[in-house]
Amino acid sequence: MIGQLSGKVDSQGDDYVIIDVNGVGYLVYASGKTLGKLAEGEFYKLFIETHVREEHIHLYGFLTLEEKIFFNLLQSVNGIGTRMALFILSSLTPSDIQIAVNNEDKNIFKAISGVGAKLAERIVLELKGKVAKISSGSAIIKESLNIKNITPVASNEVIKALVNLGFSRFEAQNAVQGIITQNPEISIDELIKTALKNRNSNF
């Protein structure tokens, strides 16, 4: 599975971008908000969600981990697939969605073309508990880790990434806490690299 791509923007379409990684062009679908921030010829890192189906393999790219999380979160709603999830994220930021769901504001979703009253209601109802869980977990992480440069949701993703790389959850949380305490402005990439380096040096 592809987790991220770092490369140069070769070209763009209405709903996708071609990222050139060492001469190989990857077609990556993205939201309008993400596409609007990409410039041809410039280098970017995109967080990738890979969808493997019998008839195709599609890559979906995001400039932030938050957008990737909400892309998957939206698809947990009955009636929302990848295209609709991207369409919603083209109109609303993850923060917009979080606030709307917490406030039970269906109108913000109904204002999006293709989202009717019933779907707007399902989004609010089905995401209410999930968004609240993200909010609460993020607040706890932010408070305990004193995060400045790294957002709460992103820090949680770093912990998950470290667990996938062989850390126990306890080890991952302690590693992230220790590193950010020493360097609150550290980037996500450097945080993961430092955690891995520190772990390897202990063996």
Curated annotation (Swiss-Prot):
Keywords: Cytoplasm, DNA damage, DNA recombination, DNA repair, DNA-binding. Residues 150-203 are annotated as: Domain III. It is found in: Cytoplasm. Residues 143-149 are annotated as: Flexible linker. The keyword Nuclease does not apply. InterPro entries: DNA_helicase_Holl-junc_RuvA_I, NA-bd_OB-fold, RuvA, RuvA_2-like, RuvA_C, RuvA_C_sf. GO terms for biological process: DNA recombination; DNA repair. The RuvA-RuvB-RuvC complex processes Holliday junction (HJ) DNA during genetic recombination and DNA repair, while the RuvA-RuvB complex plays an important role in the rescue of blocked DNA replication forks via replication fork reversal (RFR). RuvA specifically binds to HJ cruciform DNA, conferring on it an open structure. The RuvB hexamer acts as an ATP-dependent pump, pulling dsDNA into and through the RuvAB complex. HJ branch migration allows RuvC to scan DNA until it finds its consensus sequence, where it cleaves and resolves the cruciform DNA. Belongs to the RuvA family. Has three domains with a flexible linker between the domains II and III and assumes an 'L' shape. Domain III is highly mobile and contacts RuvB. Homotetramer. Forms an RuvA(8)-RuvB(12)-Holliday junction (HJ) complex. HJ DNA is sandwiched between 2 RuvA tetramers; dsDNA enters through RuvA and exits via RuvB. An RuvB hexamer assembles on each DNA strand where it exits the tetramer. Each RuvB hexamer is contacted by two RuvA subunits (via domain III) on 2 adjacent RuvB subunits; this complex drives branch migration. In the full resolvosome a probable DNA-RuvA(4)-RuvB(12)-RuvC(2) complex forms which resolves the HJ. This is Holliday junction branch migration complex subunit RuvA.
